[in-house]
Amino acid sequence: MSPWSIDSPGADINIGIGTREVAVGPRRPRWTPARKPASPAGPRSVPMPETQWFTQAGAFDALRAALEPEPDSVVPQAPRVPSRTRGVHIVLDDFWGNHAILRGDFRTLRAREVDEIARAHFVDTYGVDGETIVVRACVQRGGRAMFASALPRALVDGMREASASAGARMLALKLCLPEMLNRTLHSTPRANVMVVFAADALIQAVLIEAGCWACYDVQRLFAGDACDPAKVTLLAEQAFERCAERTTLRHEDCALGFYGSGIAVDLAALQARFASVTTLAPSNACHELEGGESFARHLLEYAQ
């Protein structure tokens, strides 16, 4: 067994948690010796039973199963040396949380005050108890906008407990959208842009005006929507209409960046409406994954 394989007792691993499956793969060390062979272990997936799709219980059970050694894996005898607990880095499908972009003057606020503003927003918007959510907020350079995310505390605690029960320690837990934004914004050609991320159960949009975060929008994708180009295109246009209400932007002034792995979209229709359209990931190819698989395998790259 390679020391970098998923089942190695001390190896850190990446986890992608979708709505219908959990994917697990080896984590690449930051510094790898030049002569060290690449790990032969690839990612593997653990599907949730259909009755547990979109449920925390299904995610917890699949996470525990994903962290267990494969039944047919053969672990050779190794010298008895102290080994550290496996660390897991988890990225969640955005279905499991909520996001928001808040505008204001945050320049003089401390991190705790910024978090409390974000918490108050989610409490007011969704009517939840502030103690039941875990909030993360990031203020954009310049201090005039904040990107905030919230996760149910029960989900965070459950992920930590499921990892611990399988002999692993949760080192990181994050939602996918902020990671996708960080990796795709440099590919957008204009200061005014709407970036659309369509994957699995959600179509999300982030509108940027003059280089500043302006608005966030999210809509649900239901069964069959991903393979309906007209539907996906309509949802993208509706997202712009809602976001643009808070700005002075028009379609013709705004570029569009579309990330739609496995999502069918009518790019020609979007190109006729927006100043330009940039495809940030393969689109116009509907890949309905067999066996109820979800977006989980794609999440692994954002856990690295």
Give residue spans per PLM region.
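Hydrophobic/aromatic-enriched cytosolic interaction surfaces used to assemble or bind macromolecules
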Residues: 1-304
